[in-house]
């Protein structure tokens, strides 16, 4: 997304920001006028022998001043070279280009963590191989392009799952004891529980690929684990907690400079009840039941100091709530940075994300209040986004708290979803993207059309685009109960013996592959080996992100069927 010490510049004519360029002529010493030897003509500057002759003919005071100037200039040049990783090879001596480093990958860590050893699935899916089933109500298409004319490396990753974790039953206990697809550890007899709950994500890396690759392999697993432990917590809060956890784990790794923007979406089946307190007009049954049980328990405790009444109030409330509940399709989103998610509703583009850029007034105020500053629309003059995962060296300013939304899908009007990095949005508006692919029923073809359009419009960044085409007829059948319900604990299709989530099944396959290769993934030896590998990776770590792009477009947010949770945005 952004050019940095590990990425090539977007334009050869602007290979390095002006603030980082060093004029080689500043290292030449120009003797002051008044010297007896220079009253008739000036000697050419820049040569070694010229400087030596000038020093021999100049007074001692001038020699000392010039020596001090040369020392300071040399020190400045050395520091600039180290911070920007300037190349000093003869082939590149004519211009200051960033040194080409091998992209950081997680291959060396795969032997220590099954999640990091999962092979790429179809369409280069970082989460592994995930395919639709006859009961799937959506189809995913993904196209990515390095943009080789402008980029030497591909720093984007993406992930998706067709059968993400099932929606928990109301008042389910923590750790997923009552949750479909998560009650048992995967084993040889385990099978994937078909949930029709989708997970989609795009990670746009900068200053190397490490953070983006790590998130592509791990974020959905962290999210699933948090959802299992908090089955009655609203999903937007769980998304915020997941991003915070990911940020904390990345900060502990030695690769401090790598970071990524992120946009993720969850498409879930939920039993929901009407709610006047929700912007969507309804709320999920599980959190509502938990809140009602807690409220009734508190009132009973005040009337009678009997603690058992609080715990027994839940089952008595649940039947009343279930009578009002209806099955609905819900889309949850979360993003940090400038990757976007767009929902097409009746042909209109609805943006369900927020561009966290230095040009945004709200984000600029937040950065200033945190002790930073915005220079040339960049955080401290370095990073073009104000929120990201990773970037530990700027973590006091660049937070990982996401912007979250909650949208109830309207099957009669909601057609498809677009997730893409800024490589597309820099040259294409939200509505243009919708208009380009609205009449393209195939999701894969639609994603390719958008990437090709961005290349034709001279996008200078890596390109990743994901299109999720909704099967409106299938959604209507489930909502109208003309088809068997799916996705929520308690449904007949969820009652699978030794059933596990799709993510758990993929990890189990990777663990078996490691076992067949006689590679241990636990114990002190594995942990020590993991730390040794990580510390070795630090030696080749790219420098901080240096963005050459200057985007002045102000973000616009579509306020439709959305709720904000822990966004920190006024």
Swiss-Prot record:
Cell compartment(s), UniProt: Cytoplasm; Nucleus
Alphabetical list of InterPro entries matching this protein: PP2C, PP2C_BS, PPM-type-like_dom_sf, PPM-type_phosphatase-like_dom
Record domain PPM-type phosphatase: where: 139-470
SUPFAM superfamilies recorded: PP2C-like (SSF81606)
Catalytic activity: O-phospho-L-seryl-[protein] + H2O = L-seryl-[protein] + phosphate; O-phospho-L-threonyl-[protein] + H2O = L-threonyl-[protein] + phosphate
SMART domains named among the record's database cross-references: PP2Cc (SM00332)
MF (Gene Ontology): metal ion binding; protein serine/threonine phosphatase activity
Enzyme Commission code: 3.1.3.16
Class in the EC hierarchy, top level: hydrolase
A Gene Ontology term for the protein's cellular component: cytoplasm
Positions annotated to bind Mn(2+) 1: 204-205
Phenotypic consequence of residue 204 to A: Decreases activity
Bias kind Polar residues: ranges: 1-28, 119-136, 306-315, 553-570
Disruption phenotype: Increases phosphorylation and mitochondrial localization of pgk1. Decreases formation of autophagic vesicles. Decreases conidia formation and aflatoxin production and reduces virulence on maize and peanut; double knockout with ptc2 exacerbates the effect and also leads to decreased colony growth. Increases sclerotia formation; double knockout with ptc2 abolishes sclerotia formation.
Residues annotated to bind Mn(2+) 2: 204, 422, 461
Region (Disordered): 1-72, 108-144, 295-318, 516-570
Keyword terms of this UniProt record: Cytoplasm, Hydrolase, Magnesium, Manganese, Metal-binding, Nucleus, Protein phosphatase
Disulfide linkage: none
Annotated function: Serine and threonine phosphatase. Dephosphorylates phosphoglycerate kinase pgk1 at least on 'Ser-203' to negatively regulate targeting of pgk1 to the mitochondrion, thereby negatively regulating production of acetyl-CoA and consequently aflatoxin biosynthesis.
Family indicated by similarity: Belongs to the PP2C family.
Name assigned to this protein: Protein phosphatase 2C homolog 1
Annotated source species: Aspergillus flavus (strain ATCC 200026 / FGSC A1120 / IAM 13836 / NRRL 3357 / JCM 12722 / SRRC 167)
Organism placement in taxonomy: Eukaryota, Fungi, Dikarya, Ascomycota, Pezizomycotina
